[in-house]
Amino acid sequence: MNSWFANISVNLKLGLGFGLVLVLTGLLALTGWTSLGSLIDRSNWMGDIGQLNKDLTDLRIARLQYMIANGDDTAAANTLAKLDAFSKQQAYLATTFKSPENVKLLGELGDTISAYKLSLNKMRQGYDATRAARVSMDSSAIRADQAMDALSQEVMARPEADSVRLAQYQLISKARQQLLQVRIDVRGYIAENSSANEQAALRQLDAALADTDNLKRQLPSEDARLQQFENAVLAYRDAVRQFRDAVANITTSRAEMTVQGADIVKRSDALYQIQLERRDIESTQARSLQAIATLLALLVGVLAAVLITRQITRPLQDTLVAVEKIASGDLTQHMRVTRRDELGVLQQGIARMGTTLRELISGIRDGVTQIASAAEELSAVTEQTSAGANSQKVETDQVATAMHEMAATVQEVARNAEQASHAATGADDEARAGDRVVGEAIGQIERLAEDMHRSTEAMNLLQQESQKIGSVMDVIKSVAEQTNLLALNAAIEAARAGEAGRGFAVVADEVRGLAQRTQKSTEEIEELIASLQHGTQQVANAMQGSRALTDSSVELARKAGSSLESITSTVSSIQSMNQQIAAAAEQQSAVAEEISRSILNVRDVSEQTAAASDETAASSVELARLGGQLQTLVSQFRV
């Protein structure tokens, strides 16, 4: 196993080591990702449960509002809507959770919601029954009043000489007072559903029925009318009892809903507490798993680092010893290499390098003698070459000086033409920039003109709408005047009614006061609308003048744009001619510089040739000296 690992490549060794670390790191990341996903899911579930609790709170508030509103249809619809929202959230949670404990709680919660809905429907039926009972009481009271009115008219129509006429009328008035007291007691019972109020209302009804029996004895001729009155009072009593039963049903439903609501809250809190406990358990598991995976990754990483380091550093140390021996001149060693990885290939290369160096040193010894004899011959030839190169250098310097002066003159012309071209280009750019600015100004002014036109139309529309508001205010003013008259008439009628109409008179005075304040506010609004219409007209006139000035500005900007276009065209022509002049001068300058460079190159070559000849002569002497030194150095190697 160790031999196999030693023979695989360093890339593969490092790849295996880092690969194991990366795999464990990936597993660690996967573990963290999975744990994080579980926590996120748990948080989402807790959020859903929080939404369920919010829906429950909304439902309980809606139920209280429904009870405060005494069974109002709008409040009932709102309560049903909140109950449906709560039920839908519960059904959604039932499809989301898979744990048996959660599913059981959600199932129990669903059953409680169904029972809660039944109780709510019973309460609605109770409120519907109370409304029906009140309608029945009102209709029965109206029939009883009508019977008493007809009976009173018949009694009052009798001759004044009738001795029993006054006594019969007093009995009828007493029965009417009894009926009025019954209605007052029933209203008190409706306002406060207490047993005492209920018994008081029923006792008063029984008293009214007893007076009816007395009337039957006193007025046997009016038995039909009295029977109608008695039937109406009996129906009124039945309606009161229906109201009592409906109130009892409402009270029972309220108690049931209170218990069911508390049960829903308890189960919802239990469901939320379960999620908290599961979250804590999953957090602990995630931390433990992360710690184990981290320790395992660190352990494997350390082991891989130690093993790979030993497989790489030991052969490197052996190779370093061999290289140091070669550096010290000892070429007698022979390395034995068995590894087949990159380090083995390196050791084999160093072994071949030692063999090659031995052969090289042996060859150098033989070549040093030949170099010494060749150096003497080279020195003689170099002296002749140096004399000819010095003569050529003098002639080339004279030609180079003349060409340099001509090139300087041509470059001056080219610079002047180029400066003129740059100036024309700058003028052309400025003219084009001015043209663009004018174009943008024209566009801005045209858009301003369009905005002014739209603003004028908007002001006209505002003026029309303010006129419509004026007509609406006339209607409101007329309605306020009519309300004032109606309130005045109601106050007069209430005054005629005396003590019984005092409360109605107070209400009529309040309505009249409201109508007068409405009329006064309407007049103030009319004044504001008139001021608004006047200001709107002034703004519209001013915007018409601004629109005319804007159109004139657009025309002037267009003329300025045309002038800038002409200037731009002229500057472009000047720029084109300057560019042609500059191009011609640059071509002449380039030709002159090319000739000058060629002559300078010739001169440089001559100088280099002369210098090379001198150096060659010196090198020949030096070469002979180096040959001796080389023989001395080669003798240091042991082969």
From Swiss-Prot:
Name this protein carries in UniProt: Methyl-accepting chemotaxis protein McpS
PROSITE patterns: CHEMOTAXIS_TRANSDUC_2, HAMP, HBM
Position of the signal peptide: none
Consequences of knocking out this gene: Mutant fails to respond to succinate but responds to toluene.
GO cellular component, as recorded: plasma membrane
Keywords from the UniProt entry: Cell membrane, Chemotaxis, Coiled coil, Membrane, Methylation, Transducer, Transmembrane, Transmembrane helix
Modification after translation (UniProt): Methylated by CheR2.
Keyword hit for Cell wall biogenesis/degradation: no
A GO MF term: transmembrane signaling receptor activity
PANTHER family: METHYL-ACCEPTING CHEMOTAXIS PROTEIN MCPB, METHYL-ACCEPTING CHEMOTAXIS PROTEIN TLPQ
Binding site for acetate: D138, R183, R187, Y236
Membrane topology designation: Multi-pass membrane protein
Organism the protein comes from: Pseudomonas putida (strain ATCC 47054 / DSM 6125 / CFBP 8728 / NCIMB 11950 / KT2440)
SUPFAM superfamilies: Methyl-accepting chemotaxis protein (MCP) signaling domain
